[in-house]
Amino acid sequence: MFICCKAPARGFGKGTKTLSKFDNTSYASIARISTSTHRSALHTRKASSSAKERQRADREQLTRLLKESPGKRDARNFLKQFDAPKPKKGEGSTAPKAKQGTSEVVRKDPGTTRTGVNLGNLYQPTVFTREPLPEKKYEEEDKEEPLHLALVKLRQPQNLDDRTLGGIALTLSQMAQLGLSTAVVLDCAEYDSEDLPQIDGAYEKMLREQAARFVATLEEYNEPGALLIEHALGKTKEQNVIPSTVQIRGGVEVKNSFLLYPPIDDGVIPVVLPIAYDSDLKKVAVEADDVVLALIREFAGIAAHADRGAFEMSEASSGNKDLDDAERPILDRIIVLDPLGGIPSVNRADGAHVFVNLEAEYRDIKLELQRLSAAAGDEAKSKPAVSLGTGNPFSKFVEEEVATTHGGSKHHLANPAPMRHLKNLDVVQRALRILPPTSSGLILTPTEAARKAIPDDDRSTPSKNPLLHNLLTDKPMISSSLPTSPASRFLGSVSPNPPTFLKKGIPVTMVPDPRESGPWRPPSASNPSIELAEDPRINFPKLEDLINDSFRRKLDAKDYLDRIRGRVAGIIIAGDYEGGAICTWETPASLRGVKIPSQASETPDSPYWVPYLDKFAVLTSSQGSGGVSDIVWAALTRTGFPEGVVWRSRTSNPVNKWYQERSTGTWNLPGDQWTMFWTTNGVTKRWDGNEWDLGQSNSLTRWEAYVDVCNGIVPSWADGIKRAD
């Protein structure tokens, strides 16, 4: 009789029983004859191993440090999701006991320090290590907590050296310490093709070798161990038969989920191969992306069955009759480790989308990648003898950096990389559509995932690991609204793309919509200004509530509408008024009363109409998380006012650091009450007085117009106090 148990733990210098590293189909007979009570206990979300207790104590210690650190705001999403449940009255917590002191054995154990989590300069103290924990029986009835899970797809592990693979295993073990368990899908395909590789001796041997290699590496760092799962997947002939937002491809389904849940419950990392069994119990190769989607549907409690074109919750099909939604793991992250890195962007100097709001950007990015793929295909046809590296920069990286690594083969990697990026984008988008809005995706290179937060020696400089940073902050390493430096330009570089952080996100509404009419233009007879309170596309009461909440002051709506009437450039709304911006066209005081020439309304670059950011607001509940600020800012500076905008903020405003990082320049206005910011280039440019009928002024610089406008804006607040916005 075979029973799924923990794999041996060697990473912490602690001995456990040496058990099998692989699953076994004979266990199916046990599951089928088990009673409902046994199955319910088997699938329960209550961790019973001592290793899980130690990980829980570590997490409790970490959350205490975060709550007391200056970086608490950045980590509040992590604290909200992963903070351990408060103990019931009369129940003693293990954390205070663990806080009493660190034993000499644990302090000197190199395995404990190598798996510590470096929180970086943002969190103090920067490193925590393990502390002694009393080995007492775990009381299941008092320790219920949800199990958080990340699903990881590792592409081409055969091309990774042992050091990189070990770094990935270390990172996954650190994520487990932080409360996020992992399951891994291996993708050993050397190239993208419509035809799947056949299950022959050589291919299966390679799969097993890489799986055994990774499982052994995981066991070195993850105390509960790792387990190779071989018999959990089945394949049907159904393909794209169900019209739904959740697309089914290839008919891959989880048939034996009892092989997955017990290891995950015990903190063991399951490693799944892209192999399934058809109705004749014959092994068939399947796409790793389809395996990822099948696992996501399983963990989300969705089974794909064609029944009059609808999805039904199927429990019997996967042996989970007693596994309710409360007992399933919470799938928080979809992680793709690909040598190509993040999703490329032709519009960013660093070459990649660092944050993708799928709700608003998916279609545009998909079209961009399809164009890149078509261009790469045309180039390959016209220049068949030319090296890939001389063409598309993505293909150049694949040829020079990936194909030359151990086990690689150049002819295997001849397909254009944009198609692989498109598949990565597609699988994450499909996954996040069926997961809660709090779930997210991350696409990065295996090398970045293996980055050590704690260096091997004192001479090395600590560096942030993108996976750990994202887990703690729910943000990308680099803000997507930051301007990119020309020095980091991707074109001409063979480096892989920076990581891409993806969220299901929120819709973005722009009135008027520049995607239909182009960038915003000054008002004219043919292009009148919109009226905020009267435009049917705008819910002004909600907009007013957003401003009041964000500024913590009540807006004098009537006075404000009177002030901006006839000069509204546009409005941006993120989600259900979670964030937004109101932009206006302002005229310098020195030009008021002067007849505005007709050509001034045809361009945003005139002395009569200065593009001005009048209000930038984000709900307090959405500040510091979710990327709402970045979403609104990107729409403002890249779509609404791509040629530049000016605004002001009170000098004491703590948000000014955020503004400064995103502006081209900043200057304190006379009186030290206001600070002026702008994103325009060439603010010293002078408009010709004769060309623009400036009269006595003869000429005017952008700088002079900006200062004039920012000095002349009068706040509109109901409290009547003429203090700064």
Swiss-Prot record:
Sequence intervals crossing the membrane:
none
Give the EC number(s) under which this enzyme is classified: 2.3.1.1
Any single Gene Ontology cellular-component annotation? mitochondrial matrix
Q: Which GO terms of the molecular function aspect are on file?
A: L-glutamate N-acetyltransferase activity
**Chain positions covered by the region annotation Disordered:** 38-119, 451-479, 502-531
InterPro entries per record? GlcNAc_Synth_fun, Vertebrate-like_GNAT_dom
- The N-acetyltransferase domain sits at 527-702
Key words, A-Z: Acyltransferase, Amino-acid biosynthesis, Mitochondrion, Transferase, Transit peptide
- Kindly state which reaction or reactions the protein catalyses: L-glutamate + acetyl-CoA = N-acetyl-L-glutamate + CoA + H(+)
- Would you identify the family this protein belongs to, as annotated? Belongs to the acetyltransferase family.
Biological role stated in the UniProt entry: N-acetylglutamate synthase involved in arginine biosynthesis.
Q: What protein name applies here?
A: Amino-acid acetyltransferase, mitochondrial
Q: State the species of origin.
A: Phaeosphaeria nodorum (strain SN15 / ATCC MYA-4574 / FGSC 10173)
| Gene that encodes the chain | ARG2
